[in-house]
Amino acid sequence: MNKKKRFEILSLFYKKNSNPKIELVFSSDFELLLSVILSAKSTDVMVNKITGTLFQIANTPQSILKLGFNKLRHYIKSIGLYNTKSLNIINSAYLIKTKYNNKVPSNRTELESLPGVGRKTANIILNVLFNKNTIAVDTHVFRVANRTGFAKGKNVIEVEKKMIKIVPSIFKKYVHFWFVLHGRYVCTARQLKCKTCFIEKLCEFDKKK
């Protein structure tokens, strides 16, 4: 895909949604961190359902630590990998309380030192909370980038590096959310909605439906 076509695609996304938002519901930095940790291998809908209850009980490092591992497991048991996620959340809460003065770290190295926080999670946190032009590549972004021909790559790191290089700075903060929403509701894994897709004419996918 050439530079001109990419710019047209991004311009159409901007025209349709000039201020895309993450679909996770949160009211503090720590709540977002927990929500993103919980979202691994799960849906935002499921995470929001769980945190709607959990955050009324515990939504700070102190209250999570007071809640403890077993009770935390009880609140998130309907989500995948809940044992691992419970342990990661407890350990991350401890580090944030003891090492980072109860504040979510604002740089990648410190973020990725937290249990349960990998590159994708760090990219989301840096983008949403700290206004950084990071591009998190999840399954939706990976699919849309490859399928449309926008930024092809064999793995998420390859796609991320390519997108960082080719996406103009004015669009960098938004492109993750545009592609996530597009992959979630239009360019889905199986039920493609090409006939109603607003970038269909620019898309280079050769098996449109």
Curated annotation (Swiss-Prot):
UniProt keyword NADP present: no
This protein's UniProt keywords: 4Fe-4S, DNA damage, DNA repair, DNA-binding, Glycosidase, Hydrolase, Iron, Iron-sulfur, Lyase, Metal-binding
GO molecular function per UniProt: 4 iron, 4 sulfur cluster binding; class I DNA-(apurinic or apyrimidinic site) endonuclease activity; DNA binding; DNA N-glycosylase activity; metal ion binding
Binding site for [4Fe-4S] cluster: 187, 194, 197, 203
EC code(s) of this entry: 4.2.99.18
Functional description taken from the UniProt entry: DNA repair enzyme that has both DNA N-glycosylase activity and AP-lyase activity. The DNA N-glycosylase activity releases various damaged pyrimidines from DNA by cleaving the N-glycosidic bond, leaving an AP (apurinic/apyrimidinic) site. The AP-lyase activity cleaves the phosphodiester bond 3' to the AP site by a beta-elimination, leaving a 3'-terminal unsaturated sugar and a product with a terminal 5'-phosphate.
Name of the protein in its database record: Endonuclease III
Species for this entry: Buchnera aphidicola subsp. Schizaphis graminum (strain Sg)
